[in-house]
Regions:
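A short glycine/serine-rich beta->alpha loop
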Residues: 2-4, 18-27, 55-63, 106-117, ...
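A short, small-residue-rich loop immediately preceding and capping a beta-strand
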Residues: 22, 58-59, 109-112, 142-160, ...
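Cofactor-binding active-site loop characterized by glycine-rich and histidine/acidic residues
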Residues: 32-173, 390-391, 432, 436-440, ...
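General beta-strand structural signal in soluble alpha/beta enzymes
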Residues: 62, 151, 160, 180-182, ...
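Thiamine diphosphate
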Residues: 92-104, 122, 128, 132-135, ...
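Non-catalytic terminal/interface segments that mediate subunit docking, oligomerization
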Residues: 313-496, 554, 573-582, 588, ...
Length: 708
């Protein structure tokens, strides 16, 4: 039997054995794509099993994540730290081989996949990050960032709407180092897809600016390898789709080519028949040493990385500042002066005490942070002028219409010294005259995603996972529903992605209930490991941005107003970052010696409403504390002593927020001023009155709570 056939059959055997032992899983796709994996991993993929985090490795994404045993088998066979015992513990509690691939759980897994269509979209993010980093950091003779992104995807990924968003942007951005291999087996859970999936996939991708190859025999490793080689040679900077006709469950005499191969164990009898059909006489989980030897990539991977290390050493000698900056950014570390930048930004906001919408406050903070952090990569889903995600430091990202290359801004007229070359957007080779061939202008750092909220969110996940950039993107809060599953995936993966959601309430006014967020803040707060901030003025907004940028292990959602918000005077800025703090005590409104009898908790624009109600109550000698709680999720993580200090147990609590009331009762509220219906189309001031968001109603609600 040919070497490639044995290598593929090793995948098939491990897949069917692991699924059978777990009595759970998907053997069909791994068995069908085994030859594709042999071609890619054996002939083309650049990787080192001993160092899954090598900076210039190729990235591989298994978009059809239910085929996880394909990936686990390959990682084990090629020499990653994934043992045969790990394979035997497939889908078991706390194993390194969960049901779907999870980043940071299994060495060699680049992204968490399972929700179909998101993997190929992550891959677009990976490829975009590689292209931008190459434009920023590579210099003549020093192609230090130079790797491909590969993705396997299936019929389900093709059917998901997000795939249309992703491939459209990949074509527009000319991501020539993105190569996708389509497992075209014509089968889904419900059977043969022909009655409900009639797309001409090749023409669809070509219409989006891709090259296509095939259809080819996806069960012929040599044909697949030749197609990959052809794709790698493309000279037009277009991404490539390779259409691979495969047979799901290949090798299984009675299940191959049927939906029965998809999502259940083959059974002991069928596995025995399959072993015979494949001429694989080995016991479950037994792999011949010769097959291990054919698969092993330890030596080749070590050589590949060592060769790159030599080139990087030369690069570091020529451009020490650039090299250090690249390493810092790939590690996800912030600049050493970030804390000072954050402090200055917050203090400036406090000193100016401007009355602006929090979306504008966000842009003001972004001006400071994007100037200090060249890794910030912004964007908007066709709402830049509303989300205000652009800054002076983040011009629009553009690509040359002819070549597809990243368009750079003007190089500096006076070249920087070698000591000043740490900023890749304006570096030179250390010369002192006009720009040299090594000089680079800045790349664009603001992306026009078009009306593609879901695609934007999942692409940002890929960018964050790749490293080198901190992605943020904007849309209206109501449209966060389009992005929700990608937001959830970012939280699950524990990666730094920042979502800017503006027009956060009925305060947007006349556009009406289709655009007015009611349930969205509460809904986002339910996602584990997602920080949600709804700041109430410029200082709180600056703090929210600073915390989001420092948060390397969780994504952040910033909920921002359309309407202007007055600045809330405050004596101490330090506690804002704890998610909630006392913004006003009774003595502020003339009740110095009066005992506090209640606490008003408010978020966002409603903090001003709470402060106005506090004054009305003070006129009646009713002393209330006002607590601003810009981030319930952050406050919930604080120590018990701090929580008690902010929200004393014995005091009645009244929450005020223009949204669903359900999430507030956990704070022991006696009453909540909120909205549990959809909004209305009317000017914002009329809506505030209609829904009871007046100082008078808040004050009356407090009095009513005190009478109980």
């Amino acid at each position: 039997m040919a070497k490639e056939a044995l290598m593929a059959n090793a995948i098939r055997a491990l897949a069917m054995d692991a699924v059978q032992l777990a009595n759970s899983g998907h053997p069909g796709a791994p068995m069908g794509m085994a030859d594709m994996a042999v071609a890619l991993w054996g002939d083309h993929l650049k990787y080192n099993p001993a160092n899954p985090h090598w900076l210039d490795r190729d990235r591989f994404v298994l978009s059809n994540g239910h085929a996880s045993m394909l990936l686990y088998a390959v990682l084990h066979l090629t020499g990653y730290a994934l043992s045969i015992d790990d394979i035997k513990h497939f889908r078991q509690l706390h194993s390194k081989t969960p049901g779907h691939p999870e980043v940071d759980v299994t060495p060699g897994v680049e992204t968490t996949t399972g929700p179909l269509g998101q993997g190929i979209t992550n891959a677009v993010g990976f490829a975009l990050a590689e292209k931008l980093l190459a434009a920023e950091f590579n210099r003549d003779g020093h192609a230090i960032v130079d790797h491909h992104t590969y993705a396997f995807l299936g019929d389900g990924c093709m059917m998901e709407g997000i795939s249309h968003e992703a491939i459209g942007l990949a074509g527009a951005w000319r991501l020539g180092k993105l190569i996708a291999l389509y497992d075209d087996n014509g089968i889904s859970i419900d059977g043969k897809v022909a009655p409900w999936f009639i797309d001409n996939t090749a023409l669809r991708f070509e219409a989006h600016g891709w090259n296509t190859i095939g259809p080819i025999d996806g069960n012929d490793a040599h044909a697949v390898s030749a197609a990959i080689a052809q794709a790698r040679k493309n000279t037009d900077n277009k991404p490539t789709l390779i259409l691979c006709k495969t047979q799901i469950g290949k090798g299984s005499p009675n299940r191959a080519g049927t939906a029965k191969a998809h999502g259940e164990a083959l059974g002991t009898e069928e596995i025995a028949l399959t072993r015979t059909a494949l001429d694989w006489p080995y016991a479950p989980f037994e792999i011949p040493e010769a097959v291990y030897a054919d698969w092993s990539h330890k030596d080749a991977g070590a050589r590949a990385e060592a060769e790159w290390d030599e080139r990087f050493a030369a690069y570091s000698a020529a451009f020490p500042g650039l090299a250090a900056e690249l390493i810092r950014r790939m590690k996800g570390e912030l600049p050493k002066d970030f804390n000072q930048v954050a402090f200055d930004t917050v203090v400036a906001a406090h000193s100016k005490a401007e009355t602006v919408a929090s979306r504008k406050a966000s842009q003001l903070a972004l001006e400071s942070f994007t100037a200090a952090l060249p890794e910030m990569l912004g964007g908007s889903a066709d709402l830049t002028g509303s989300n205000l995600t652009n800054t002076k430091s983040t011009p629009q990202l553009r690509f040359d219409a002819e070549t597809g290359d990243v368009v750079l801004g003007e190089a500096p007229a006076q070249a920087a010294s070698a000591e000043d070359e740490s900023q890749p957007g304006s570096t030179t080779d250390g010369a002192t005259s006009a720009p040299t061939p090594a000089a680079r202008g800045p790349i664009g750092r603001h992306i026009n995603y078009g009306v593609r909220e879901f695609g934007m969110a999942a692409i940002m996940n890929g960018v964050a996972l790749h490293g080198g950039y901190i992605p943020y993107g904007g849309t209206f809060l109501t449209f966060s529903d389009y992005s929700r599953n990608a937001i959830r995936m970012a939280a699950l993966m524990k990666h730094r992605v920042i979502h800017v959601f503006t027009h956060d309430s009925i305060g947007l006014g006349e556009d009406g209930p289709t655009h007015q967020s009611i349930e969205h803040a509460a809904s986002l707060r339910l996602i584990p490991n997602l920080d949600v901030w709804r700041p109430g003025d410029t200082a709180e907004t600056a703090v929210a941005w600073a915390v989001a940028l420092q948060n390397r292990s969780r994504p952040t959602a910033l909920l921002l107003s359309r309407q202007n918000i007055a600045y809330a005077p405050k004596n101490d800025l330090g506690d804002i970052s704890r998610g909630a703090y006392v913004v006003s005590e009774p003595e502020v409104v003339g009740l110095k010696n009066k005992k506090t009898v209640a606490v008003i908790i408010a978020t966002g624009s409603e903090v001003q409403l709470a402060l106005a109600a506090q004054k009305l109550l003070a006129a009646k000698k009713i002393a209330v504390r006002v607590v601003s709680m810009p981030s319930t999720t952050t406050f919930d993580r604080q120590d018990v002593a701090y929580k008690k200090a902010v929200l004393p147990k014995k005091l009645p609590r009244i929450a005020v927020e223009m949204g669903c009331t359900g999430g507030w009762w956990k704070y022991g509220c006696a009453a909540v001023v909120g909205i549990d219906t959809f909004g209305e189309s009317a000017p914002a001031p009329e809506l505030f009155k209609h829904f009871g968001f007046t100082a008078e109603n808040v004050a009356a609600t407090v009095e009513s709570a005190l009478e109980r």
